[in-house]
Amino acid sequence: MVFEKIDKNSWNRKEYFDHYFASVPCTYSMTVKVDITQIKEKGMKLYPAMLYYIAMIVNRHSEFRTAINQDGELGIYDEMIPSYTIFHNDTETFSSLWTECKSDFKSFLADYESDTQRYGNNHRMEGKPNAPENIFNVSMIPWSTFDGFNLNLQKGYDYLIPIFTMGKIIKKDNKIILPLAIQVHHAVCDGFHICRFVNELQELIIVTQVCL
């Protein structure tokens, strides 16, 4: 993991960052409908497939890798790792696991299945210990679909990393649709960036050839 510190004085987002981080602290969320028909038709497992696709786009663009590290420094990680929740039916609680990114889905899926098998029965909130600092959070609420979803973080105005929440899939017009809520910090991510993310995610799902 490499964390490249940002020189704010020469940063082209300096005035935007200062405005939305300090003057008018602002986070926002957007909920979109993602066509996942291709995922189902390819026989891919939905949750790890979406983790893989989301991570691919997150790691493509610096605005989703910009963060304040544990030393309070502003910078950009060279790679982000998905941290995701799993549900425990017996206690109706959840745990967070994390799986390192791989360039191909088959390798990522193998590591995901290894992690869920090894740590899936650990009922602690941190199911897989020693999470690195360069993680981003993903969760799924498969019991209900939604048109809007918002996280209210009391101390979240210094948290720059995006958060993703998925809901229950629905079928509409011969397509399988997944609701996806994306929460970002306006200091590092504008409407253009989040829309580009959504468009590239949808394109990646459609065009990717996956060998299972």
Curated annotation (Swiss-Prot):
Lineage: Bacteria, Bacillati, Bacillota, Clostridia, Peptostreptococcales
Keyword Transferase in record: yes
Task of the protein: This enzyme is an effector of chloramphenicol resistance in bacteria.
InterPro entries in the cross-refs: CAT-like_dom_sf, Chloramphenicol_AcTrfase_AS, Cmp_AcTrfase
Subunit structure, interactors included: Homotrimer.
Name of the protein: Chloramphenicol acetyltransferase
GO biological process terms held by the UniProt record: response to antibiotic
SUPFAM superfamilies: CoA-dependent acyltransferases (SSF52777)
EC number: 2.3.1.28
Catalytic activity: chloramphenicol + acetyl-CoA = chloramphenicol 3-acetate + CoA
Alphabetically ordered keywords of this record: Acyltransferase, Antibiotic resistance, Transferase
Top-level EC class as recorded in UniProt: transferase
Domain of life assignment: Bacteria
Catalytic residue list: H186
GO molecular function annotation: chloramphenicol O-acetyltransferase activity
Coiled coil: none
Family, similarity comment: Belongs to the chloramphenicol acetyltransferase family.
